[in-house]
Amino acid sequence: MSERKTIQSYEWARVLGALAVVCLHAVVATRLVPELHQGNAALFLAEDVLCVPLTRWAVPVFFMVSGALLLDPGRQMTLEKVGRYVWRMAFILLTIGFAFCVMELVASFGFYGLLTFQAAFLNLLQGLSWGHLWYVYALIGLYLITPILSAYVRVATQRDLAIVALVGYALLCVAPTIDLVAGTKLYAFLGTGSPVVYYLAGYYASTYLELDAKVIGAGALALAANLVAFAFDPELASQLALPEYAFALPFSVLAFVAIRSLLERPMRERGLARALARDSFGIYLLHPLFGHVILRVPALVTLPLPVLQLTIVVVGVAGSVVLTRLLRLLPPFASKL
């Protein structure tokens, strides 16, 4: 695969992944409204099941795209480059993440001047901003260890990488899954390391894997096992679909390889997909804001659930694109979003 085609497929991954995340969060946000959940329990269960194959692969694939690009032996990851990547994410947290922390405190407790800002900053340092920003915190950690991982993949064989990836998967994804299902404590730091597995898996998959029977079979088996779990314990099954548990990696690898294999065609320069690709990071960061606003409007909350969720998706994507482009007019944000 040529570099151009590889880049194009990753652009498609960003677009599809961003849209998938917005759809997932529309379901999650509406489920958290008690009156909506009580009146639509069966529909929410069906949506939870559908979200596994349609949306849960998105954030893992984001990590895998980063790993495929940044761990490429042909790419020089100097400390200066790492510093720029880390500063970009830190800037996002110190601005957008901090604003979300302030909004959360004001909505919950009211505004108390400097005390609110101090509490918001402490929450930000502890990772207590809006939940979807865990991805940004994780990227900072991945960028910091990229020089070490990059040096390793330059000398590692395919077998070496496979062993490291499998051991990491066992320790950081399988063990937490056993803990969740059986109530054991095989791995005390539950879920903290799974992004590393996806980061390495992205490089491995981009280098060695094709869309063949093995990849399809492993992904389909993991997906089927996760879906079967809904018949026994829907709440547990929903948790097992998260990236830090064992079912997500095989299916996410399948999604990643499928996108690389099937979506190699370039986007039209002035097309919708290209526009969404340019704004995909902003869409990921900003879309929850619009969902929160919509769910505070009584007239909108009374809409039929699918209509309400579609409204959240459409307004979330469109509003995020507009807000992203407005923020880019400010010099500090121009190269960050």
Task: Describe the residue ranges of each PLM region.
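Transmembrane alpha-helical segments of integral membrane proteins
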Residues: 288-299
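Loop-centered beta-sheet repeat module
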Residues: 159-208
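Aromatic-anchored segments of alpha-helical transmembrane domains
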Residues: 23-26, 97-98, 165-179, 220-234, ...
